[in-house]
């Protein structure tokens, strides 16, 4: 079937594009809204970071849970020039090589020259020596020039040095 484009109307107030099309057969007409979307491209950066983990006492009343608690203090280098502060909770499994942790940290500084802050959420497990780690930007946590930031981060440790890989979209 041959489609004939019969008109376009740009509605600036709502940033919607309305396209009216007519079909050659049946002369049926319909209006189709399409949102104008600014192209967003995934970006990738990597670099080093320094980290200080400081053990903390268990929260009062939950000592029997045998959870580890630490503060996080990081300094990121490279295209992410930032400082982060956060907290981590961890638990060891009953079998050697099994454990888990969760952490939240607020990262403040510049990302490829754009200033602001955002929050990273960590979820990590070690299942009998096999690690699995997810670190993602908390939705809508970006501030200032980092508003709308989304993404995921990976961490590698080589020769006692810490490295990050950050895949992100910034509108």
Please identify what each model-predicted range represents.
Residues 4-5, 13-171:
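Targeting-peptide/extracellular-domain and disordered-appendage signature
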């Amino acid at each position: 079937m041959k489609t004939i484009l019969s008109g376009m109307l740009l509605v600036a107030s709502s940033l919607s594009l309305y396209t009216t099309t007519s079909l050659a057969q049946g002369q049926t007409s319909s209006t189709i809204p399409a949102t104008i979307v600014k192209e967003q491209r995934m970006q990738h950066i990597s670099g080093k970071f320094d980290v200080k983990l400081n053990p903390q006492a268990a929260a009062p009343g939950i000592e029997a849970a045998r959870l580890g608690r630490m503060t996080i203090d990081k300094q990121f280098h490279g295209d992410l020039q930032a400082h982060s502060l956060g907290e981590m909770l961890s638990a060891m499994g009953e079998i050697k090589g099994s454990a888990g942790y969760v952490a939240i940290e607020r990262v403040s500084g510049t990302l490829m020259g754009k200033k602001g802050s955002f929050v990273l959420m960590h979820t990590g497990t070690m299942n009998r020596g096999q690690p699995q780690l997810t670190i993602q930007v908390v939705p809508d946590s970006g501030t200032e020039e980092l508003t709308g930031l989304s993404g995921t981060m990976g961490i590698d440790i080589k020769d006692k040095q810490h490295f990050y890989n950050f895949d992100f979209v910034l509108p």
